[in-house]
């Protein structure tokens, strides 16, 4: 079908924008050839008469967008209003991404730093080699022959041959065998991610997979972090999946750090957006509904899982403690935990380029299916939606926002950068978030035919809008609190379109400097206190182990 077949109306003249990102005004609605709102940014389209008693008054066209923006137009002719609604609905729900604007976008700025080559895996490996020689680059997945959701080049344990990797892939969900995600220089502890083992009801075993994991062990036992609940892991075993049996993985401790599943996250966001748009409700009832929505719980669970990973890697007095993370298919909660833990552990991941590198490695190249997950957001319902849609990446961004709220001086970027990434993950003129894997990017020539989002960000004129002027680089680990009173609603995300623009304006330079000085002092005090408390906990744990009877 041609795009022209979907277009019933090309332009609607003299429409009145009653509600939107601009002051109320009369103008034309252009379906194409003008760039104001991408078709893909529209999540749901509604059309109804202005007056049911008098249809001659025209219709109301409501566009509910994926970034929670609501736009309402008054159109004088009800039939034209309905035709416009059908057109926008069709264009915003085209299957696939080959007609997305990114393929037709011509960059208005000179690309000074090509984002497509900014995070080359071989460069990443070269930096890793400065810290350890225990790993190598493998081309076992050349032409995506072993695992379609992995990139072609992967970092794996040095002593493991490609034949073992191939066998392990048959034992792991979707072929996602263990690969290096991160290496902590100070403790020399590797972070590895994969998918669940396919042990099934018969307790199937794979000695090659056991060998791969055991090759990571040097002087201390490792940890396997499962991001599923106990019931989910048990249910998975009945369906052919499961978790590593202690008898076969004797050198590993198994820990469960559950993060909500895709559908739970999707429903939580829908409820959260609904609560945040509610006006006629008492404050007590509103607070109760926020808790019942489950969104903040999902963010807190993600932070808790990441903190547990970081705690295993950064155990005081212990070195070389390998950590393996997996959930089910390794495409969602696994990536949340692996990426957030790196931000906790590594100050470089809290810079703009370092954060981009985490997203590129742990989300885009790691195979998070952006096109499937972000096809719709919180408003869409009915037949246009699919079972694979879930705002998993937004949970990650909100968790980072919670870190910034608690450590406002430790990040080179501010929440504007996070919101920018959220919007472009759902609808963008750039190609970075297109497709579901590197395999799809290569098949459709996305890296050749589109502009990278990072090329836009790296331009000096663009980057300055994301810089945190209060940034004070710190090299230490950060430990955000997950206490309920510390996990806050992301105002700028959920209420951005409900407040006047000037309420979000940045304070004056003197005010910023005063706040910066205050938060620097406060952060140092809290960091020192947190370190002291952690030492006390470790000492108490050791005393308990010594005093406990054998």
Predicted segment positions?
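Cys-dependent protein tyrosine phosphatase-like superfamily
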Residues: 1-323, 339-550
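Glycine-rich nucleophile elbow surrounding the catalytic serine of serine-hydrolase chemistry
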Residues: 328-342
């Amino acid at each position: 079908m041609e795009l022209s077949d979907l277009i019933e109306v090309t332009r609607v003249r003299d429409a009145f924008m009653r509600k939107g990102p601009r002051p109320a005004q009369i103008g034309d609605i252009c379906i194409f050839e003008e760039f104001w709102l991408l078709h893909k940014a529209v999540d749901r389209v509604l059309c109804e008469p202005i007056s049911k008693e008098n249809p001659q008054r025209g219709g109301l066209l409501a566009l509910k967008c994926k970034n929670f923006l609501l736009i309402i137009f008054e159109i004088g002719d009800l039939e034209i209003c309905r035709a416009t609604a059908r057109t926008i609905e069709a264009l915003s729900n085209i299957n696939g991404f080959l007609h997305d604007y990114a393929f037709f976008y011509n960059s208005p700025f000179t690309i000074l730093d090509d984002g497509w080559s900014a995070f080359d895996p071989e460069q990443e490996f070269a930096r890793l080699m400065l810290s350890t020689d225990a790993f190598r680059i493998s081309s076992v997945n050349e032409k995506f022959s072993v695992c379609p959701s992995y990139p072609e080049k992967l970092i794996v344990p040095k002593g493991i041959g490609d034949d073992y990797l191939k066998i392990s892939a048959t034992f792991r969900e979707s072929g996602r065998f263990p690969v290096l995600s991160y290496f902590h220089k100070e403790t020399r502890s590797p972070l590895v991610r994969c998918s669940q083992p396919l042990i099934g009801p018969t307790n199937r075993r794979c000695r090659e997979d056991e060998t791969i994991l055991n090759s990571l062990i040097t002087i201390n036992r490792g940890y396997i972090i499962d991001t599923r609940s106990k019931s989910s892991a048990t249910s998975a075993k009945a369906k052919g999946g499961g978790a590593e049996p202690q008898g076969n993985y004797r050198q590993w401790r198994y820990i469960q750090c559950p993060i909500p599943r895709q559908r739970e996250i999707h429903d939580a966001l829908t409820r959260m957006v609904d609560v945040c748009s509610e006006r006629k409700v008492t404050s007590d009832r509103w607070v109760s509904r926020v808790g019942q929505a489950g969104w903040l719980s999902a963010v807190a669970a993600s932070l808790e899982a990441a903190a547990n990973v970081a705690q295993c890697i950064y155990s005081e007095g212990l070195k070389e403690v390998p950590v393996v993370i997996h959930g089910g298919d390794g495409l969602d909660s696994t990536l949340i935990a692996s990426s957030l833990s790196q931000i906790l552990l590594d100050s470089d991941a809290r810079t703009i380029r370092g954060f981009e590198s985490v997203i590129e490695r742990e989300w885009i190249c790691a195979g998070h299916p952006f096109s499937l997950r972000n096809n719709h957001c919180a408003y869409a319902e009915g037949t246009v939606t699919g079972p694979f849609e879930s705002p998993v990446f937004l949970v990650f961004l909100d968790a980072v926002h919670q870190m910034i709220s608690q450590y406002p001086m430790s990040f080179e970027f501010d929440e504007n950068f996070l919101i920018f990434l959220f919007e472009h993950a759902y609808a963008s003129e750039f190609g970075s978030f297109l497709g579901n894997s590197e395999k799809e990017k290569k098949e459709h020539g996305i890296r050749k035919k589109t502009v990278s989002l990072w090329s836009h960000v790296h331009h000096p004129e663009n980057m300055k809008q994301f810089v945190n002027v209060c940034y004070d680089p710190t090299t230490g680990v950060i430990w955000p609190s997950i206490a309920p009173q510390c996990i806050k609603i992301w105002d700028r995300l959920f209420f951005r379109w409900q407040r006047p623009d000037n309420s979000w304006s940045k304070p004056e330079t003197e005010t910023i400097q005063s706040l910066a000085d205050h938060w620097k002092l406060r952060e140092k005090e809290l960091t020192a206190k947190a370190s002291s408390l952690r030492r006390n906990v470790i000492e108490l744990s050791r005393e308990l182990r010594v005093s406990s009877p054998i």
